């Protein structure tokens, strides 16, 4: 590697809002606080929420359905 062009890496502690802590190397020199990590993210934990798209469509139709029907009739 060329001298003087690469940033210095430091070992830092990353702290998640769930309380999980781990060490990593980064160009940052101070601890890092994050909101989501692999211990609490739904993709990694398998506890994903299923979005009720049918309920959203029904809610949209209830709210705007009358207006859309009036436009279709004219």
UniProtKB/Swiss-Prot annotation:
Query: Matching PROSITE patterns, A to Z?
Result: RIBOSOMAL_L31
Is the keyword Zinc assigned to this protein? Answer: yes
User: Which keywords does UniProt give here?
Assistant: Metal-binding, Ribonucleoprotein, Ribosomal protein, RNA-binding, rRNA-binding, Zinc
**InterPro entries, sorted:** Ribosomal_bL28/bL31-like_sf, Ribosomal_bL31, Ribosomal_bL31_A, Ribosomal_bL31_sf
Q: What does the record list as GO biological process? A: translation
How this chain assembles, per its entry, is: Part of the 50S ribosomal subunit.
Protein name per Swiss-Prot or TrEMBL? Large ribosomal subunit protein bL31
- Organism of origin is Nitrosomonas europaea (strain ATCC 19718 / CIP 103999 / KCTC 2705 / NBRC 14298)
Q: Which gene encodes it?
A: rpmE
